[in-house]
Amino acid sequence: MNKEKVSILISNYNKEKYIDECILSCLNQNYNNLEIIVCDNNSTDNSLDKIKRYSNKIIYKSKERISNYGPVNQIDILTEAFKISSGNIICLLDSDDFFFSNKI
């Protein structure tokens, strides 16, 4: 039986304190046919550095600052993540939250 591919989309903005636990909760899922996509919304803390540490296990993208207006809205960030996702099923996760290992 083929398992559907699941894409977990995470938007991040200045959640340095939580992003490790968030990503690890996705990597530790019992379900293994998944991809994890983290889009950083131009964070000003060390979030992106932490995200990059997982670059061999996740897909990440950093949104460029638009003019001097600061970060873009969360919908735009999730749209970017959705565009590069390849899963048949999409799960959304905020970067200050986590999944239990049997979520997927």
Where in the sequence are the language-model features?
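Nucleotide-sugar donor-binding/catalytic module of glycosyltransferases
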Residues: 1-104
